[in-house]
Amino acid sequence: MIALIQRVTRASVTVEGEVTGEIGAGLLVLLGVEKDDDEQKANRLCERVLGYRIFSDADGKMNLNVQQAGGSVLVVSQFTLAADTERGMRPSFSKGASPDRAEALYDYFVERCRQQEMNTQTGRFAADMQVSLVNDGPVTFWLQV
């Protein structure tokens, strides 16, 4: 399971002209689900995403996680993160989970975030989405479990 996380000052996702999720300061989480992923990996990745210390403390050091910084989370499904790009000029998606399994794990991940008392907004699974963000820093990390 893969999360591309970006520290943002604001972010939103729009589906068919309707804003489905919007946050102020916090994390934009692009979530990719691979074939061998399961609930255990989703738990671990959620723990890492919410615990990752990439927000500045009073001394300007990256020492606070999103909860400590008072931020929110916007989770957007992103199957292209599971692409195999090692060969050729066209990505292969053979490493990705089936759509049904990916959606179940995406929903599970979102619910785990919410159980941690995080303001968690979402896109719409498998929809054509437009994501807008202001990357703060820029600060972007690839987390994989």
Swiss-Prot record:
GO terms for biological process: D-amino acid catabolic process. The keyword Repeat does not apply. Keywords: Cytoplasm, Hydrolase, RNA-binding, tRNA-binding. InterPro entries: Daa-tRNA_deacyls_DTD, DTD-like_sf. A motif (Gly-cisPro motif, important for rejection of L-amino acids) lies at residues 137-138. Pfam families: Tyr_Deacylase. CDD domains: Dtyr_deacylase. It is found in: Cytoplasm. Its main location: cytoplasm. Coiled coil: none annotated. GO terms for molecular function: D-tyrosyl-tRNA(Tyr) deacylase activity; Gly-tRNA(Ala) deacylase activity; Ser(Gly)-tRNA(Ala) hydrolase activity; tRNA binding. One of its GO terms (cellular component) is cytoplasm. The keyword Disulfide bond does not apply. Transmembrane segments: none annotated. Its EC number is 3.1.1.96. It catalyses: glycyl-tRNA(Ala) + H2O = tRNA(Ala) + glycine + H(+); a D-aminoacyl-tRNA + H2O = a tRNA + a D-alpha-amino acid + H(+). Belongs to the DTD family. An aminoacyl-tRNA editing enzyme that deacylates mischarged D-aminoacyl-tRNAs. Also deacylates mischarged glycyl-tRNA(Ala), protecting cells against glycine mischarging by AlaRS. Acts via tRNA-based rather than protein-based catalysis; rejects L-amino acids rather than detecting D-amino acids in the active site. By recycling D-aminoacyl-tRNA to D-amino acids and free tRNA molecules, this enzyme counteracts the toxicity associated with the formation of D-aminoacyl-tRNA entities in vivo and helps enforce protein L-homochirality. Homodimer. A Gly-cisPro motif from one monomer fits into the active site of the other monomer to allow specific chiral rejection of L-amino acids. This is D-aminoacyl-tRNA deacylase. It comes from Escherichia coli O81 (strain ED1a). The lineage of its organism: Bacteria, Pseudomonadati, Pseudomonadota, Gammaproteobacteria, Enterobacterales. The gene is dtd.
